From Swiss-Prot:
Protein name: Large ribosomal subunit protein bL20
Source organism: Agrobacterium fabrum (strain C58 / ATCC 33970) (Agrobacterium tumefaciens (strain C58))
Lineage: Bacteria, Pseudomonadati, Pseudomonadota, Alphaproteobacteria, Hyphomicrobiales
Gene: rplT
Keyword set includes Ribonucleoprotein: yes
Entry's Gene Ontology cellular component terms: ribonucleoprotein complex; ribosome
GO BP terms, alphabetized: ribosomal large subunit assembly; translation
Length: 134
């Protein structure tokens, strides 16, 4: 069996690692051993932070919705409850965007949520409200 030299593949792997470490500080961008550890760690952080990013954006959307809804005298939780009871299904990202860019449309949703909360306080069940609204 012929002998296999690994110089070409090793150089390619090293080049790939050093290319990924571009912009790192100090030895981490020059030395294979340090660069490999830094790149591995950076990939772990990137994986973790892709999950954290989703949580952070959801929290931001909720804060924006809460701020916009409080101007109308509701809290975020009551507003979401009212939307659910009114049968309106809009996600938080869209609600946040509407609160910033289309306040009139967002105000209509707030009024629908208030109406649903008031109606259900008087009547009783969600099904009656959905038939009354339609």
């Amino acid at each position: 069996m012929a002998r296999v030299k690994r110089g070409v593949t090793s150089r390619a792997k090293h080049t790939k690692t050093l290319k990924a470490a571009k912009g790192f500080y100090g030895r981490r961008k020059n030395t294979i051993r340090a660069a490999k550890a830094a790149v591995d760690r950076s990939k772990q952080y990137a994986y973790r932070d892709r999950k954290v990013n989703k949580r952070n954006f959801r929290a931001l959307w909720i804060q924006r919705i809460n701020a916009a809804v409080r101007e109308s005298g509701l809290t975020y939780g009551r507003f979401i409850d009212g939307l659910n009871k009114a049968g309106i299904e809009v996600d938080r990202k869209v609600l946040s965007d509407m609160a910033i860019h289309e306040p009139a449309a967002f105000g209509a949703l707030v009024e629908a949520a208030k109406k649903a909360l008031e109606y259900l306080k008087d009547a009783g069940t969600t099904n009656e409200f959905e038939t009354a609204v339609k």
